[in-house]
Amino acid sequence: ADRTGRNFVAPREAKMMENISARLQHMDETGVDVQVLHPTLFIRQVADRPEADVAVCRSYNRWLADIWKQSDNRLRWVAMPPVLDMKAAVQELEFAVEHGACAVGMRPIEGDRTLPDPYFHPLYDAANELGVAVAVHIGNSNPYVERLLGGGLGGSAFPALRLMCAAAAHALILSEIPGKFPNIRWAFLESASMWVPAVVHDLRRRIRASKGKD
């Protein structure tokens, strides 16, 4: 507020989406036309059974669809796919786009899979056809990896959650995904950008080496 002259601290009922009118009023007061809602709940694994994953994601997506309906298209949102059931994940994305979603959310690691895994191709194909972004939020859906990196380094979320975005971006750029699904826009959220130069430097080195250059 000191630098912008605007107070972005919203009342609880607006922040927690308990009162949509209050949220819209706060947006008006701060000069914000549109917001994109992204959850914190899903930065970690929410279920280890497909049917539970579907139930949690479907409930969340229906809630956000109702919020969007009340907002006159001002509260867009990120759909959460139940990635343990890829058929259901595609169905959820299709529903979400029809009800105000502008992106599909993913974690840098999904269980025992990384994002270039062909398992996710049906979801990427749907995002490519629907024209929505893939929003990779800091997170980790592999409990073992999260415990190993977080607990082993003093409990820090930096290696366990944030650095995973750098690894995901690096892997995606080296994969066939950008060429296979050219309409997808990728976003890496809440991971800052200090890792970008390191990723770009390493990619340049690898690409030069693959072409036989020093």
Where do the PLM segments sit?
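Helix-coil boundary/capping segments in enzymes
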Residues: 1-214
